[in-house]
Structures are given as C-alpha cells and as structure tokens.
Amino acid sequence: MKNYLLQIEYFGKNYCGWQRQSHSPSIQEELEKALSKIANQNIEVTCAGRTDTGVHATSQVVNFHSDADRNLSSWMRGTNALLPQGIKILDIKEVDNDFNSRFTATNRTYNYIIYNSAISSPILAEHCLWENRQLNIDKMNQACKYLLGEQDFTSFRSSQCQSNTPFRNIQKAEFIKQGSFIVFEVVGNAFLHHMIRNFIGSLLKIGLEFESPEWIKLVLEAKDRTKAAETAKAHGLYFVGVEYPEFSFRRRVIELFC
C-alpha cells in the first residue's frame, strides 16, 4: 500500500466546499470519484484544510493510500482528464505511509483578495471582493497586530463551528497593496469556521475608518461573535499554502493575477 500526496487547485464557486455532502457537489467527492476510477478501487482522501462553500484553493494538499499499480504520471494525467474544469492536480509524489496531509501540517496559509477600485471588474467579480471606497491599509495593518499569537478567537468563530476549543495560534496577519489589489495574508496553525472571513469583515470597518485599530482588541476581549462585524463573502478567500516539517507548498493568488 502506497501513500500519495497531491497538490491541487480549485475554483470553489460551484461546490459546497471541500467536504463531501449528500445534497450538493463537493471538491472531495469529485476528486475521490476520479481517483477511484483510475485506481479501479474505492479511494478516500484527506486534505490539509477543509474549505467552505465558494472558497478557492491554489495549493491545497491531499493524500490517499492505494495499492493500485499506477505510476505517478498515470495518476496525475488520468485523474485530471476525469476531473471537471474547476479542479486540477498540479503535482503528485509518493510520501511515507505515516504522512497525513491534515495532522502532519504545522501551519496553513490563506489569502483574501480585495479589488479596491472605483469601478468593479466583470472578469474579477467571482475571484475577489470588490470595495469601491478607499481603504486605509496602514490602520488595517495596525489592527492585525492584535490578532497575532495564541489566543481565544471566540469573537471570530461562527455559531456552527464544531471545534472543541476557540484557541488558535496566528503567526502572520498582514495586508499588502499590489496595484488595485489588496491582499490579506494570514498564517496559523489552524482556523475556526468562518474565522478569516470574520477577520476581514471587521478589518474592513477599520480600513473604512468606521472603527479604530484598537477596536479589534476590544472585540477579541469580548469573546462575543456579535461584537465583531459581518462575515465577508467567500469568493475572495483562497487556501494558498501548507507547511510540513520536511517540506512546504505555497502559491499566492496574486501570482496568478499578475
């Protein structure tokens, strides 16, 4: 039995998220279906980070076990031929049998893309959040400092979050302006349900100068979801990287746009 690692990219619009659901198509379902056909046996996959409905990935990492006699090229080319256009395998390699794409990971990286322009773009509409008002990035980055470290993120978790603990460790949270794009990059050991999109909703209020950077500190201390702003839309969020003890994968979204 061999253990295979896949690096995959997907456009999340037409899917109910990563996880298999009975009522709607999912990334997991499509990938397992294609792999199972190539292997001629049932294949189950594990991913580094389960994304929600409408969220995209440029560098999701998946692993699966199989004893099917296939070389790496056959796995990749055959599976890609069966996958829908919105999901593709970028790379494949064999890894140790004890490797688990979820539990072996040490941290995960997400990007949230904001198109900050007076006029919206029809082409970019499904790929990033449009904000026509000018954002104060300096103040947004001042607020980001309060998100760093290991702390209780109750104020930024959804009511449907199933995690046993609200504590997470955020190693990086930063906005970078690249032309008309504003890219939020956040790195953490793991994330709560809707956590990043809830960050964005509140940080936008600061960028629009409705709140001060210090307001984020008060929201965190309240440990109350109702004290934070509304959840930002899903289509601006991308899973872009994951780090393991021996290797890492990362493809920033802006590299695809520029």
From Swiss-Prot:
Q: Which Pfam families match?
A: PseudoU_synth_1
Enzyme Commission numbers on file: 5.4.99.12
Q: Which residues form the active site?
A: 52 (nucleophile)
Catalytic activity from the UniProt record: uridine(38/39/40) in tRNA = pseudouridine(38/39/40) in tRNA
Under HAMAP family, the record lists: TruA
- Function according to Swiss-Prot or TrEMBL: Formation of pseudouridine at positions 38, 39 and 40 in the anticodon stem and loop of transfer RNAs.
Protein name in UniProt: tRNA pseudouridine synthase A
Origin species, per record, is: Francisella philomiragia subsp. philomiragia (strain ATCC 25017 / CCUG 19701 / FSC 153 / O#319-036)
